[in-house]
């Protein structure tokens, strides 16, 4: 099993759209953002599909909204990791915050891991809706494929008579509608291409930042002033706009202290030579 996947592995260059399509197709969901999977329930069910019977799905809360409930899901996931001897660390405190990049990175790893089992072939007998149900009633998973009540209500209405159908078909120029649909389809394709390119570029630079972070966490470099300054920028919150200024100020102060110490040591050596 490919549990140890390096940051430069091709798995971490899989775009957001591909990840969402993978989740939605396999679990019959309709997620539109990766952060919607921050509760950990999706990850639990992905492993339930990959390793039938290993995940206690009755303990997985698909309605988790607060951090406490989400953490309980991740505890279930951690237990499953332990059973399967998966060494991937779960950064629960970061995942439950719902930050897109943190969740995207974990889902990229999960997809790579699941694809490495049985060649990524899906279990055809697996019913995702039934597995995440409680007492025969589907849980209210955000983004699940349900029929809106308005459509259900409309289905109960008697069908229109043939004369009204004929009138509706005759109304409006078909050619104009066809041209409009074609134009919108082309615009949609162009937008998708642009989005995919932007996602690849974003993921590329994210992987670079991740490499810098790993380098900064090296014990031999951890206390160097330049490394501390870089960490101040890497770990700055979104609201902190002066991260660069703070890092520069810290670096200047640290280097200033070192220069003063070096100058003091030089003067002391010069004085000792004079006395000698």
UniProtKB/Swiss-Prot annotation:
Disulfide bonds: none annotated. Residues 173-243 form the EB1 C-terminal domain. Residues 257-270 have a biased composition (Acidic residues). Pfam families: CH, EB1. Belongs to the MAPRE family. Composed of two functionally independent domains. The N-terminal domain forms a hydrophobic cleft involved in microtubule binding and the C-terminal is involved in protein binding. In Arabidopsis thaliana, EB1A and EB1B possess an acidic C-terminal tail that has autoinhibitory function, but EB1C has a tail region with patches of basic amino acid residues required for nuclear targeting. Plant microtubules behave differently from those of other eukaryotes in mitosis: they lack centrosomes and spindles are barrel-shaped with unfocused poles and no astral microtubules. This is Microtubule-associated protein RP/EB family member 1A. It comes from Arabidopsis thaliana (Mouse-ear cress).
């Amino acid at each position: 099993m490919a549990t140890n996947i390096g940051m430069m592995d091709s798995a971490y260059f899989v775009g957001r759209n591909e990840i969402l399509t993978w989740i939605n197709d396999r679990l019959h969901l309709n997620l539109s953002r990766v952060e919607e999977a921050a509760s950990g329930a999706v990850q639990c069910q992905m492993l339930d599909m990959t390793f039938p019977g290993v995940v206690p799905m009755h303990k997985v809360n698909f309605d988790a909204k607060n951090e406490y409930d989400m953490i309980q899901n991740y505890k279930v996931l951690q237990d499953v990791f332990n059973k399967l001897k998966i060494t991937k660390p779960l950064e629960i405190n970061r995942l439950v915050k719902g930050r897109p990049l943190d969740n995207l990175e974990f889902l990229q790893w999960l997809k790579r891991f699941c694809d490495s089992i049985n060649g990524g072939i899906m279990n055809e007998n697996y019913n995702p809706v039934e597995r995440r149900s409680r007492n025969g009633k589907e849980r209210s998973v955000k983004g699940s494929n349900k029929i809106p009540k308005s459509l259900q209500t409309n289905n109960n209405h008697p069908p229109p008579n043939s004369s009204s159908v004929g009138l509706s078909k005759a109304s409006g120029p078909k050619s104009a509608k066809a041209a409009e649909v074609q134009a919108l389809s082309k615009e949609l394709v162009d937008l998708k291409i642009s989005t995919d390119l932007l996602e690849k570029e974003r993921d590329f630079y994210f992987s670079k930042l991740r490499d810098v972070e790993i380098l900064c966490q090296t014990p031999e470099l951890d206390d160097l002033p330049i490394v501390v300054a870089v960490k101040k920028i890497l770990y700055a919150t979104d609201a902190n706009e002066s991260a660069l200024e703070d890092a520069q100020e810290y670096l200047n102060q640290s280097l200033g202290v070192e220069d003063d110490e070096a100058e003091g040591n030089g003067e002391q050596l010069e004085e000792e030579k004079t006395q000698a």
